């Protein structure tokens, strides 16, 4: 699958959007956790409930004619690593409870989707000399239709590398403990970015799979190993 892709500085991206939101006129921010959707009755002729706001973990109620859910991986999220698991939306952040239950109580059906993430790499432990640099476009296209264009700052390259038979053999030894294969996880994974376990199982005839080392930002040594998302035990992926 071919598509445009932007590699962003994770910290600066977050800081820029916070700055934008905090400087948007008539927009007020409240840091809390939504735990319940509040409903009221529509006009009698329709007879169906209508959302009227939310209640937060701190007990504050916000009234609204419309509630937009941008929940990501947090609604009743569970994180797996081998046979171990813990509630959470991502490492270090709690799962969110209450919103799903509110929807189910109103007759909505809830299901589960799954996604994975690779272990991050320390740039100080990477031998970049054996990797193939992947540079960004000199004149990149935009994702938006906005005519407002800013000059591209000095870009950092990504790097291309491939798995090997040795890597495949190590990972296959952990298939018995992998939630993907022992029945713990039954959700369907993302179609265009399968986990490394899915790739080894589905494309068992392939001797290698390409991986991209992507810098997470200018202020960190962390590299994201794109193409190596996994739910195997940490000692196997490292």
Specify the residue positions occupied by each region the protein language model found:
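Conserved N-terminal/central alpha/beta ligand/cofactor-binding core
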Residues: 1-36, 58, 70-90, 94, ...
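Glycine-rich, flexible beta-strand/loop modules in the N-terminal catalytic cores of phosphate-handling
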Residues: 2-6, 204-227
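Short, hydrophobic/aromatic-rich segments at coil-to-beta transitions
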Residues: 48-53
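Core beta-strand elements of the Rossmann-like FAD/NAD(P) dinucleotide-binding domain
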Residues: 57-66
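Short beta-strand segments
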Residues: 69-70, 214
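Long, low-complexity segments enriched in small/aliphatic residues
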Residues: 132-217
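Conserved small/polar residues in nucleotide/adenosyl-binding loops
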Residues: 234-238
């Amino acid at each position: 699958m071919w598509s445009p892709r932007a590699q962003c500085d994770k910290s600066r991206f977050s800081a820029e959007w916070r700055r934008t939101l905090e400087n948007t006129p008539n927009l007020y921010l409240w840091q809390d956790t939504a735990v319940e959707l509040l409903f009221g009755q529509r006009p009698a002729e329709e007879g169906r409930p209508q959302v009227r706001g939310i209640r937060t973990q701190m007990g504050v109620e916000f009234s609204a004619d419309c509630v937009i859910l941008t929940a990501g991986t947090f609604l009743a999220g569970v994180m797996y690593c081998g046979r171990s698991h813990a509630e959470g939306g991502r490492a270090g952040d709690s799962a969110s409870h209450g919103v799903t239950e509110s929807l189910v109580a109103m007759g909505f059906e809830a299901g589960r989707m799954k996604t994975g993430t690779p272990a991050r790499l320390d740039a100080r432990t990477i031998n970049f000399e054996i990797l193939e640099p992947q540079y960004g476009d000199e004149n990149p296209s935009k994702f938006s239709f906005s005519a407002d264009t800013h000059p591209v700052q000095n870009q950092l390259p990504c790097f291309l590398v491939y798995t090997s038979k040795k890597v495949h053999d190590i990972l296959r030894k952990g298939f018995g403990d992998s939630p993907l294969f022992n029945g713990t996880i039954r959700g369907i994974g993302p179609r265009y970015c399968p986990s490394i376990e899915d790739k080894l199982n589905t494309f068992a005839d392939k001797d290698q799979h390409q991986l991209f080392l992507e810098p997470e930002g200018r202020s960190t040594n962390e590299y994201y190993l794109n193409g190596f998302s996994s739910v195997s035990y940490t000692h196997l992926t490292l």
